[in-house]
Amino acid sequence: MEKRAMRMLAMFVLGTSFWSCAGFPVYDYDPSSLREAVGASVAKVNSQSLSPYLFRAFRSSLKRVNVLGEDSLSMDIEFGIRETTCKRDSGEDPATCDFQRGYFTPSAICRSTVQISAEKVQDVWVRCRWSSSSESNSSEEMIFGDILGSSTSRNNYLRGLIPDVSRTEPLYERSLETMRRFPPPGNRSFPNQWPRARTNTGFE
């Protein structure tokens, strides 16, 4: 029995060695890679938000890694962001800025997908759930990414973008007419209070 177990262990070691030598990429996910991906995600938010202050990340964690090729992969990350005391046009590194204090300081929990190729960040997509700055307990979601379209101001801090082409399609007009004639089920006297995801592209 012991000899059989040793034989199986030896076969397992040889098998893993074979796959490593057969060209399958082996990645070492050190903390610096995670910091770089989080930094790129925060930079995407800061580049497309309308807040006069920079946001800084806190409590980041790696959720998933997808190998795309021999030298490329994507990382799914979850992290929090909070507004800092540094002005957006100050040129400061958000990681060196102090967080603003106060109960109503803008903050959010975000999930991002960062594509890395040849050890360089190639693409970043971020989705954040923002806590409301009002006295209500409502929240809203925003999507930050590089999608072509025109911008429309959505609130004091963030921009939600809707491609112009979708507004010119007959299907879009028919959908609006259907919504006017047949409101969604539930209490028809009050608007829908569920937060909606918004797409942010950064193009004016």
From Swiss-Prot:
Q: Which GO terms describe its biological process?
A: bone remodeling
Q: Which Gene3D superfamilies match?
A: 3.10.450.10
Q: Which domain of life is it from?
A: Eukaryota
Q: Give the record's keywords alphabetically.
A: Disulfide bond, Phosphoprotein, Secreted, Signal
One Pfam match, given by its short name, reads: Spp-24
The residue range of the signal peptide is 1-23
Where are the Phosphoserine residues found in this chain?
Answer: 90, 138-139, 166, 175
GO CC list: extracellular region
In terms of InterPro entries, this protein maps to:
Cystatin_sf (IPR046350), Spp-24 (IPR010892)
**Location of this chain's protein in the cell:** Secreted
| Disulfide bond sites | 86-97, 110-128
User: What post-translational modification does the entry describe?
Assistant: Multiply phosphorylated at serine residues.
Return the annotated region ranges for Disordered: 179-204
Quote the function comment for this protein: Could coordinate an aspect of bone turnover.
Family according to the record: Belongs to the SPP2 family.
This protein is called what? Secreted phosphoprotein 24
